[in-house]
Curated annotation (Swiss-Prot):
<keyword id="KW-0460">Magnesium</keyword>
<dbReference type="InterPro" id="IPR012089">
    <property type="entry name" value="tRNA_Cyd_32_2_STrfase"/>
</dbReference>
<keyword id="KW-0820">tRNA-binding</keyword>
<comment type="pathway">
    <text>tRNA modification.</text>
</comment>
<feature type="binding site">
    <location>
        <position position="128"/>
    </location>
    <ligand>
        <name>[4Fe-4S] cluster</name>
    </ligand>
</feature>
<dbReference type="InterPro" id="IPR035107">
    <property type="entry name" value="tRNA_thiolation_TtcA_Ctu1"/>
</dbReference>
<feature type="binding site">
    <location>
        <position position="216"/>
    </location>
    <ligand>
        <name>[4Fe-4S] cluster</name>
    </ligand>
</feature>
<dbReference type="InterPro" id="IPR014729">
    <property type="entry name" value="Rossmann-like_a/b/a_fold"/>
</dbReference>
<protein>
    <recommendedName>
        <fullName>tRNA-cytidine(32) 2-sulfurtransferase</fullName>
        <ecNumber>2.8.1.-</ecNumber>
    </recommendedName>
</protein>
<keyword id="KW-0963">Cytoplasm</keyword>
<dbReference type="GO" id="GO:0005524">
    <property type="term" value="F:ATP binding"/>
</dbReference>
<dbReference type="GO" id="GO:0051539">
    <property type="term" value="F:4 iron, 4 sulfur cluster binding"/>
</dbReference>
<comment type="function">
    <text>Catalyzes the ATP-dependent 2-thiolation of cytidine in position 32 of tRNA, to form 2-thiocytidine (s(2)C32). The sulfur atoms are provided by the cysteine/cysteine desulfurase (IscS) system.</text>
</comment>
<keyword id="KW-0004">4Fe-4S</keyword>
<comment type="subunit">
    <text>Homodimer.</text>
</comment>
<dbReference type="GO" id="GO:0000287">
    <property type="term" value="F:magnesium ion binding"/>
</dbReference>
<dbReference type="GO" id="GO:0000049">
    <property type="term" value="F:tRNA binding"/>
</dbReference>
Length: 313
């Protein structure tokens, strides 16, 4: 076999693998949008673009779905320039103009505020997050955006669940859709069903101009990084565990938790049968059927159906 033929076959295989990856991401995003009612007809979606792999992928997939969705919605990309030293201000405008999407660059010196308020070596995430949230909410109002799309994915949601359990004493994660405290903004996370490793592969293949974050990426031993490494270890040692855990987040039996605010334990009386509540049978050893997980390299995309988002080419 000639070298030219080998190169052609290799390129064909790479194209095939990329197409499978892209379709998997589009399907996962489409299903999340449909399952949680994230985007409706006439919406203006403000995609928050940080310059990282997640938000680039989010914008790219939403733009693709926009072309084939059965509903009409607008997209505007927004980047918050936090005035970090050395931040390449030209990168995002050049990229956004090259793909022809409406965008707005918001310039606020949150970097200076965080550095002034937080002692050296301490975690800046909490203050930085609050500052960014307020600015993005204000910007959404100014732009007339009806939805704010963030780039958090499945692995972020799982990490947040464990962070809250380990350090906050709560069973709480990132919701795929939420409303702000004042009821004026709806935040959505269309990548909720997407694996981080899929997003990483996609970002590399698309050659997105990634911009590192000096505020959080340079801080060692963050609690989130510790939890993330724990999840990555589980994923390597026990394939399918993360999928099972994420499935558990969608299958909660409140009567077998311990929160009296969510379930009326005091109201349980003798002779009472309540539909939908598992009693002592839930203590029986359950017959666990192994979950069927999608083989990333053997996925059949001949059926390109997506819930509410049909036929993406």
């Amino acid at each position: 076999m000639s070298e030219l033929t080998q190169l052609a076959q290799q390129e064909k295989k790479q194209t095939y693998n990329f197409n499978k990856l892209q379709k998997r991401l589009r399907r996962n995003v489409g299903n999340a949008i449909a399952d949680f009612g994230m985007i409706e007809d006439g919406d203006k979606v403000m995609v928050c673009l940080s310059g990282g792999k997640d938000s680039y992928t989010l914008l790219d997939i939403l733009l693709n779905l926009q072309q084939s969705a059965p509903i009409k919605f607008d997209i505007v990309a927004v980047n918050l320039d936090q005035k970090q030293p050395g931040f390449p201000e030209h990168v995002l405008p050049e990229y956004l103009e090259s793909i022809g999407v409406d965008y707005k660059i918001v310039q606020e010196n949150t970097y200076g505020i965080v550095k002034e308020k937080i002692p050296e070596g301490k975690t800046t995430c909490s203050l930085c997050s609050r500052l960014r949230r307020g600015i993005l909410y204000r910007t959404a109002t100014e732009l007339g955006a009806t939805k704010i799309a963030l780039g958090h994915h499945r692995d972020d949601m799982l990490a947040t669940l464990f962070l809250n359990m380990f350090y906050g004493g709560k069973i709480k994660s990132m919701p795929p859709k939420l409303i702000s405290d004042d009821g004026k903004q709806i935040v959505i996370r269309p990548l909720a069903y997407c694996k981080e490793k899929d997003i990483e592969k996609y970002a590399i293949a698309k050659e997105f101009p990634i911009i590192p974050c000096n505020l959080c990426g340079s801080q060692p031993n963050l609690q989130r990084q510790v939890v993330k490494e724990m999840l990555n270890t589980w994923d390597r040692q026990y394939p399918g565990r993360l999928e099972t855990m994420f499935s558990a987040m969608q299958n909660i039996t409140l009567s077998h938790m311990c929160d009296p605010k969510l379930f009326d334990f005091k109201g349980i009386k003798h002779g009472q049968l309540i539909d939908g509540i598992e009693g002592d049978t839930a203590f029986d050893e359950e017959r666990i059927t192994p979950m069927q997980f999608e083989d990333e390299d053997q996925t059949d995309f001949s059926n390109k159906e997506m819930i509410n988002f049909k036929e993406v080419n």
